[in-house]
Amino acid sequence: MRLRNKPWARDAIAQNPDLVIQQPATWKGNWHRCFGRQAPLYIEVGTGKGQFLTGMAKHHPEINFIGIERYESVLVTAMERAKEAELTNLKFLSEDVYDLLDFFADGEVSRLFINFTDPWPKKRHEKRRLTYKDFLAKYEIVLKEKGDIHFKTDNQGLFEYSLHSFSKYGMILHNVSLDLHNSDFEGNIKTEYEEKFAKKGMRIYRCEAQFRTNEESHNL
């Protein structure tokens, strides 16, 4: 994906510290205080321009949401969307998912979304895929017991790889869809990419993957 340079993005983000959290590590284990309330915490890695997470925050005011996006030129659009919607249950981090454990305590997150991530199709880039086992290990730490991942992609190869990765890690798969928009699944909120792909008639793949409890893993 080629990104347009927006030299003003960094300054715009810096002027909104209540929305794009600076030094997020200081809130590790205390995100409920950052939001000013106790509520389940859902995060999206690679939040892009924020259409999905803004929609989720509108539809689920009872949930606290955090979007993680490392590219400021993209994040600034998500920030403006959230500002316009006046959402108090949505915040962003201009950070890299590699550093996830620096920002969230063990078991602090209830759900994690991965939407239309870069498929990194070459074998030598496997470790960069956000469903690679090393990333799953990070997600497992920050997610609560029985926490889950909701995953969407247009890339069949990445979807098949991810199903295998989830299963090999010992996760439980739910609601696997090979054609989301022609399924009975309700409550789907589209990302920008998803809308674009859907207009072209492309299939959207979706699944939910849940980590096993220690007891469930022991009984395997």
Swiss-Prot record:
Q: Does the keyword Methyltransferase apply?
A: yes
Q: Which GO terms describe its cellular component?
A: tRNA methyltransferase complex
What EC identifiers does the entry list?
2.1.1.33
* Bilayer-crossing regions: none
Which Cys residues form disulphide pairs?
none
Q: InterPro entries from the xrefs?
A: SAM-dependent_MTases_sf, tRNA_(Gua-N-7)_MeTrfase_Trmb, tRNA_methyltr_TrmB_bact
* Active-site residue numbers: 118
SUPFAM superfamilies per the record? S-adenosyl-L-methionine-dependent methyltransferases (SSF53335)
Q: Name one GO molecular function term.
A: tRNA (guanine(46)-N7)-methyltransferase activity
Q: Which HAMAP family match?
A: tRNA_methyltr_TrmB
Q: Which PANTHER family match?
A: 3-DEOXY-D-MANNO-OCTULOSONIC-ACID TRANSFERASE/TRNA GUANINE-N 7 - -METHYLTRANSFERASE, PENTACOTRIPEPTIDE-REPEAT REGION OF PRORP DOMAIN-CONTAINING PROTEIN
Quote the protein name from its UniProt record.
tRNA (guanine-N(7)-)-methyltransferase
- Per the record, the gene is trmB
